[in-house]
Amino acid sequence: MNKKILETLEFDKIKALFEPHLLTEQGLEQLRQLAPTAKADKIKQAFAEMKEMQALFVEQPHFTILSTKEIAGVCKRLEMGADLNIEEFLLLKRVLLTSRELQSFYANLENVSLEELALWFEKLHDFPQLQGNLQAFNDAGFIENFASEELARIRRKIHDSESQVRDVLQDLLKQKAQMLTEGIVASRNGRQVLPVKNTYRNKIAGVVHDISASGNTVYIEPREVVKLSEEIASLRADERYEMLRILQEISERVRPHAAEIANDAWIIGHLDLIRAKVRFIQERQAVVPQLSENQEIQLLHVCHPLVKNAVANDVYFGQDLTAIVITGPNTGGKTIMLKTLGLTQVMAQSGLPILADKGSRVGIFEEIFADIGDEQSIEQSLSTFSSHMTNIVDILGKVNQHSLLLLDELGAGTDPQEGAALAMAILEDLRLRQIKTMATTHYPELKAYGIETAFVQNASMEFDTATLRPTYRFMQGVPGRSNAFEIAKRLGLSEVIVGDASQQIDQDNDVNRIIEQLEEQTLESRKRLDNIREVEQENLKMNRVLKKLYNELNREKETELNKAREQAAEIVDMALSESDQILKNLHSKSQLKPHEIIEAKAKLKKLAPEKVDLSKNKVLQKAKKKRAPKVGDDIVVLSYGQRGTLTSQLKDGRWEAQVGLIKMTLEEKEFDLVQAQQEKPVKKKQVNVVKRTSGRGPQARLDLRGKRYEEAMNELDTFIDQALLNNMAQVDIIHGIGTGVIREGVTKYLQRNKHVKSFGYAPQNAGGSGATIVTFKG
């Protein structure tokens, strides 16, 4: 787009409005380079980025970006083979840190759907090794000791030598106190010296570095210190050399990634610019407009960004409308209306938000031309009319159907009759060429042109006859009218004179009455529209409040869930710890009594997650009533799965049962009846445990062949627990070879189990790699 329109509309001042919201020099540079485009995909991308950033701010209202400096020149120097200095490395360090923080922010972002912004976040590079290298430079511009072993060694020696110098000088201060003018160590020419009285200058051996103005004090570097100072100077030279070597080394490490770092810096700047746009939206109540594909423009409550307390107006430039002609007297805001339309289009086509209400639409124009204001050339001795006409002639040769044209005071500066005729002829030429035009004029003849001509519409700026001031309200569809008689009368001009004047233009009075009626109708419609807008604004505010509350509730819910998860994890950890202790206690005993096994199993059962209390289930209660327990019934004790027999019913409703060799007292909810005759017995998954009395103790075998992975792992867990409860020293697990999935699962399980001493494949004659032998700790 031509630069002249950007200067005319003061686009640089518009861009300056976004600068306070920027945090990076890269973002500032991109803002300064910003210009309107006619590429729809670019504009749509910019609009989508702003909308996504708005959604991001709803979830993360304090989202920010670390400030960064421009590094394009630094990266260019690297690519050309130059070595960087500490200040330049600090600039790169800041960019890498900002990139890492943005990546971390994006990785932890929830409840926001991003597409366009996601592309930028995901293009950022991660350089953990380079970040580690750059930690050698602290923010004060100092190379840390850990940058290299040699640097650390040199600095240790410098520190030791300087300590020796201080010790020597402190000793001399005490020993030679009577020879010194002051009991302090001074510095001259970078050397540590003593202020010696001139009368004692020969009593202290050393190098004289200075004499006071009075000649009473001689500044001597003691001989004992001279050698140490020379060593320190030599070490300082070594330190500088080592620091240069470190700068060269790190430059070589960073050099291959210079282009990637420069690209990251650009992305950081781009995200910063999008963020600044959204901050502007929040500050100025701006909006992201819709994009029209057919040059249709609909601006709702649009304002000029540079005008303080600007009046908001509606402008509708439909697809079929070719020209809007704003008529009426000067100083009513016609030129501002013209600039507002042009500037809003320039901002939108530059990917910026506009000062308007939601629902506003903008078109796409390849060029925007304007003839606004007095551009008379004194050097060329051109009149106002000639200056405007020269510009218009140039514009008419360049415009086409993809252009927007803004003409201020068309035909002004010459004879009114000829000027009006010329203005109508120019507008007609533009209409026939279907070029969208907004023009202002004070010629009344153009009112009739706007009424009588298709695809052309009149408009005007409202004038308050009560206050004799313009309201700057845009009235589309209503031509401007002269208020000269009304103003003259209010200012005190004789009614006779005003009456005589009005009789001379009776026909014009009829037109003015019609215009006045149109104005009244327009004002009434505007009041209704304003009321509707107020309701819409209240609804929008309520919607924002509800959305904020909804997000806060979601965050609180997630916080509570996280707390619950943490508490659950703590409970599980405690349960696992208790179960391990139970197993250790069992394993430490060589022999176990039956009741000890039962008690241990019951303890383990209590550690399991709580289940639904089936005793309160009405269906199960009805089923139990149909078959009440009686003496002699076979039962299954629910707490540890052992079968037994009811031997007697106690007075308190409990039952006595014989379970193996143990007599137990149980409540009805603690056992189930076993229906042997009516139903087929349910096969329980059993672990085949075979006890032997050989020297190495009992053994067991588990066969997992043909099992699904999850089923096999559950059986393995149960099998190992039972083996530990039975104090077994060794067990065999048959898993087969197959795909190796179950075998790998067995291996991982055994590696995690702290009770396993060792495990390995069986001998070839006992199954080879299809079986694993496990030995437990003693």
UniProtKB/Swiss-Prot annotation:
InterPro entries: DNA_mismatch_repair_MutS_C, DNA_mismatch_repair_MutS_core, DNA_mismatch_repair_MutS_sf, MSSS, MutS, MutS2, P-loop_NTPase, Smr_dom. Pfam families: MSSS, MutS_V, Smr. The keyword ATP-binding applies. Keywords: ATP-binding, DNA-binding, Endonuclease, Hydrolase, Nuclease, Nucleotide-binding, RNA-binding, rRNA-binding. GO terms for molecular function: ATP binding; ATP hydrolysis activity; ATP-dependent DNA damage sensor activity; endonuclease activity; mismatched DNA binding; ribosomal large subunit binding; rRNA binding. ATP binds at residues 328-335. Its EC number is 3.1.-.-, 3.6.4.-. Residues 702-777 form the Smr domain. The keyword DNA-binding applies. GO terms for biological process: mismatch repair; negative regulation of DNA recombination; rescue of stalled ribosome. Endonuclease that is involved in the suppression of homologous recombination and thus may have a key role in the control of bacterial genetic diversity. Acts as a ribosome collision sensor, splitting the ribosome into its 2 subunits. Detects stalled/collided 70S ribosomes which it binds and splits by an ATP-hydrolysis driven conformational change. Acts upstream of the ribosome quality control system (RQC), a ribosome-associated complex that mediates the extraction of incompletely synthesized nascent chains from stalled ribosomes and their subsequent degradation. Probably generates substrates for RQC. PANTHER family: OS10G0509000 PROTEIN-RELATED, SMR DOMAIN-CONTAINING PROTEIN. Belongs to the DNA mismatch repair MutS family. MutS2 subfamily. Homodimer. Binds to stalled ribosomes, contacting rRNA. This is Endonuclease MutS2. It comes from Streptococcus pneumoniae (strain 70585).
